[in-house]
UniProtKB/Swiss-Prot annotation:
Disulfide bond annotation, renumbered to this chain: none
Any single GO BP term: lipid catabolic process
Record-annotated active site: S41 (nucleophile), D348, H351
Glycosylation sites noted in the Swiss-Prot or TrEMBL record: N118, N263, N275, N330
The keyword Signal belongs to this UniProt entry's keyword annotation: yes
Record's protein name: GDSL esterase/lipase At4g01130
Any Pfam family: Lipase_GDSL
Organism annotation: Arabidopsis thaliana
């Protein structure tokens, strides 16, 4: 698997070099002026913690050296994409101080779902900022930008231009919580029943953004959550349910079902939207390969979390998450981070490390996991 991916990426890199030498407009800037992101904790750059301030502990230790509103030890995929396109990190839409929206906004929040939650954050842990809410925030943001320019309001220096919405990337990395939140309680087969509704909501959101001017959409598929320490310790299973890499077979089969349906739905959406670019990003392929062959990427640990409690094989405890402290067996215990997160695929049993995010980002940028082919690296001048 690792060699197949490497061959594909080598071919994509060759195509990229040829295009840059013969087909690139040397005097152009980025084809895209902004990024508008919709998602959950996999792409939240601080929205959740702006709404519910509390983050502490080892989060952000690798790059930011302190908690930075991200569910990782460092940068996320969206951070790498923004920087590669010559943009600053995306400001969270919910952040009131220090935001700069000239190059887009991030509507993602930790624990968000595609479907509207039927319970509260404090009962289920699910964010109130579902995809529908994020879409409404995007629409209101556009209204405010248009009005601010028309009325020459103060604060224009931190807002994008009125024409930016047709020259932006719209990225979606959401759906994981819809899949995992009910997994332990109702099982894989019952979760699969509502996955078409999840995908339909994503496609519908793309169509609504197209209606207000959006033309380029990138949709990241669902990760192989059957390899996540949090799922491996929280989902009842036998040894027969595990593949040779230690991942849950029935869970990852359901993920594959979701991704196949997502790809098919996006293909149909692509035919319905004139002059739109709708890209399916198979980030699952890279992340699965990272879990299965970490050494091929210069890493050591696949299904073991860097930050957690419990030791081998998963270093994850359902009652003691990364950075938290509680009394276990009459002793105060803290779920601490490892000293070398660059050697781990899993940061906290639920999210990827910066190192894993970097590998995934490089595959997105070189076009090796884009369907149809879409070499994002080629859209900016050197």
């Amino acid at each position: 698997m690792a060699s197949d991916i490497n061959r594909r990426r080598s071919f994509s890199l060759l195509v990229l070099i040829i295009v840059m030498l013969y087909g690139h407009k040397g005097d152009s800037k980025c084809d895209f002026e902004a990024i508008f992101n919709f998602g959950d904790s996999n792409s939240d750059t601080g929205g959740f913690w702006a709404a519910f301030p509390a983050q502490s502990g080892p989060w952000g230790m690798t790059y930011f050296k302190k908690p930075a509103g991200r569910a990782s030890d460092g940068r996320l995929i969206i951070d790498f994409l923004a920087k590669s396109l010559g943009m600053p990190f995306l400001s969270p839409y919910l952040q009131s101080i220090g935001s700069d929206f000239r190059h887009g906004a991030n509507f993602a929040t930790l624990a968000s779902t595609v479907l509207l939650p039927n319970t509260s954050l404090f009962v289920s842990g699910i964010s109130p900022f579902s995809l529908a809410i994020q879409l409404n925030q995007m629409k209101q943001f556009k209204v405010n930008v248009d009005e601010s320019h028309s009325l020459d309001r103060p604060g224009l220096k931190i807002l994008p231009s009125k024409i930016v919405f047709g020259k932006s990337l719209y990225t979606f990395y959401i759906g994981q919580n819809d899949f995992t939140s009910n997994l332990a309680s109702i099982g894989v087969e019952r979760v699969k029943l509502y996955l078409p509704q999840v995908i339909g909501q994503i496609a519908g959101t793309i169509k609504e953004i197209y209606g207000i001017g959006g033309r380029t959409f990138l949709v990241l598929n669902l990760a192989p959550v059957g390899c996540y320490p949090a799922i491996l310790t929280g989902y009842t299973h036998t040894d027969a349910d595990l593949d040779k890499y230690g991942c849950l077979i029935p869970v990852n089969k359901a993920v594959k079902y979701y991704n196949t349906l997502l790809n098919k739905t996006l293909s149909q959406t692509r035919t319905e939207l004139k002059n739109a670019t709708v890209i399916y990003l198979d980030t699952h392929k890279i992340l699965l390969d990272l879990f299965q062959h970490p050494k091929s990427y210069g890493m050591k640990h696949g299904i073991k979390a860097c930050c957690g409690y419990g030791g081998r094989p998963y270093n994850f405890n359902q009652k003691l998450f990364c950075g938290n402290t509680k009394v276990i067996g009459n002793f105060s215990t803290t779920a601490k981070a490892c000293h070398d997160p660059h050697n781990y695929v899993s940061w906290d049993g639920i999210h990827a490390t910066e190192a894993a995010n970097h590998h995934i980002s490089m595959a997105i940028l070189d076009g090796s996991i884009s369907y149809p082919p879409f070499i994002l690296n080629n859209l900016c001048s050197p």
